[in-house]
Design a protein with these regions (language model features):
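Glycoside hydrolase catalytic-domain context in secreted enzymes
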Residues: 1-277
């Protein structure tokens, strides 16, 4: 890493960017090239640095169920980012957008159709209602085994934001309104996944991400006491008990500052206080 040029080091931070790509190009969503349907991957053009493949999915890995290969790479059959049953209900413009993100889904004649069937584990809220960390760790073990099988390095989960309001559209992904339950469940899931060599979790969304509407621009105004007693506590538990391989900051601003740009949040609390490595 020390031998990298500044240009190569920068490439490692922006996904598998192709400067020659024409038209619609996404760095995240279903942008994986080596594993079809994976959310994204790091740049594979930097010599000596292998790519890092990331897969989304709150209830297990979300990959393209079927795909084919040709001289240009791997391509999903159907839409890699949206099930056909949901695509049928979308408007014409939305179908166009989703097809651009997920591919046209039509296999070429003569190409072999390959499969990537992943296990659907219970969603976060259901897992938390079990209060059974051993079971949650077993679910993580299932995900970790499939990560090894399909060649995925980072799972972009678990999400442990607090159930602050019933109106949040992603509450089902999150564990609980209780930060203790949230932290314990995320730690158990992480231990299960990371028992597999080369596999890691990405706990998210750090922090105070409790609404989906306008999530890239909304500003969470939270007191220090509320942050420490509610919104940060689960992350601290998870980091101390399982040391996840990655932490994803949230899109929202926190008290006027983007979370990824907050030294207090990322360095002082996450690293120095929680001990994240």
């Amino acid at each position: 890493v020390d031998a990298l040029t500044k240009e190569d080091a920068a490439l490692l931070l922006i996904g598998n960017f192709d400067p020659n790509a024409k038209g619609f190009a996404s760095m995240i969503g279903t942008a994986g090239r080596h594993v079809c349907g994976a959310a994204g991957e790091s740049c594979s053009t930097v010599k000596g640095i292998p790519w890092l493949i990331m897969a989304d999915g709150p209830a297990g890995l979300r990959l393209a169920k079927e795909y084919y290969e040709d001289g240009k790479g791997k391509h999903a059959v159907g839409n890699a980012s949206m099930p056909d049953s949901i695509m049928e209900m979308l408007s014409g413009p939305m179908k166009l957008v989703m097809s651009l993100m997920g591919g046209n889904g039509k296999p070429k004649a003569g190409c072999e159709i390959k499969t990537q069937y992943c296990t659907a584990i219970p969603i976060g809220t259901a897992l938390a209602q079990s209060f059974d960390t051993d079971f949650v760790q077993q679910c993580g073990d299932i995900v970790g085994e499939e990560m090894e099988h399909f060649g995925v390095h980072l799972w972009l989960a678990p999400a442990l934001n607090i159930h602050r309001s019933i109106r949040c559209g992603r509450n089902f992904e999150y564990y609980s309104e209780d930060p203790l339950v949230s932290g314990k469940m995320a730690a158990a899931m992480t231990r299960g996944v990371q028992a597999h060599k080369g596999c890691g979790t990405t706990i998210k969304h750090y922090a105070a991400n409790n609404k989906e509407y306008n999530r890239t621009r909304n500003n969470s105004m939270v007191s220090e006491r509320a942050m420490r007693e509610i919104y940060l506590k689960g992350f601290g538990i998870c980091v101390r008990e399982s040391q996840p391989k990655a932490v994803m900051t949230s899109y929202n601003l926190l008290n006027g500052t983007h979370t990824a740009e907050s030294r207090g949040l990322v360095m002082d609390i996450l690293r120095a206080e929680f001990g994240y490595q």
